[in-house]
Amino acid sequence: MSNPTRFLSGVSTAYPNETLYSFPFPDPFHTGSTSGVGSSTYTNDFNTLIGTDFTVTGASSTFALANGLGGTAVLTPGGTTTASAAYKPATFMQFVAGNRMWYTTRIQASAVAGNVSLYAGLRNGASATEGLWFAKAAASTSINLVSTVNSTATTLVTGVATAAAATWVQLGWYYDGTDILVYANNNPVARVSAPTIGSTGTNLTNVLLSPVFQITPVATETLTTDFVLAAQEVTR
């Protein structure tokens, strides 16, 4: 790694007439590219985890920090075949035409054979009837991008990546306000052109969403997360 460029007076993204114009760091709540458009970002590298950050479902299931370089969190089902999820209870992300969104995460399952199923992405809190996530179905190792609107699931991209036991995979997408660009291990793999947004019969849901991790084991399989980022433009 080369030496960093030094901005001794700081770096600003604010307009001259704005409150944070002289603030020596980028405005964390607004974007300098378009006046009136803000930004909202959630990141977690899982070197810290507050107990109320995520709600865990599944009898006796846990979502807790584990030893690992850079920090990791492990979703451990409470029993064989116990469907288990960890999700942010307060929803804050929403697809809006014209406003950009970003999502990325790095995960690994301890095993993927048989009927182990899992997904990671954005969901409507406790409800699995709305969301957009990367999913591995039972009896498959294909990781697909799946959108669910009003309980109707649609596979937007098949074969984004291939799941393997105890193997990291980084998944992500970028919604540019019109199209969705899909990534696996930081490489572009697909584009979803002009998905529609709405409450029913559309490609994407218009409800509020938040990060989620889910696994349904067949024995003692776990799902480990290295990091997650969810960000979007917000009209403020």
Please place each PLM-identified region on the residue numbering.
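Short, tryptophan-glycine- and acidic/Ser/Thr-enriched carbohydrate-recognition patches
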Residues: 38-62
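Extracellular beta-strand elements of beta-rich domains used
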Residues: 46, 105, 171, 225-230
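Short, solvent-exposed beta-strand-to-loop segments that form ligand-recognition rims
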Residues: 160, 187-208
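Extracellular carbohydrate recognition
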Residues: 216-227
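Short, intrinsically disordered N-terminal pre-domain segments
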Residues: 1-22, 234-236
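Secretory/extracellular carbohydrate-interaction modules
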Residues: 76-143
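Localized edge beta-strand/strand-to-loop motifs within extracellular or lumenal beta-rich domains
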Residues: 167-181
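Short, aromatic/His-centered strand-loop micro-motif at the edge of beta-sheets
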Residues: 148-170
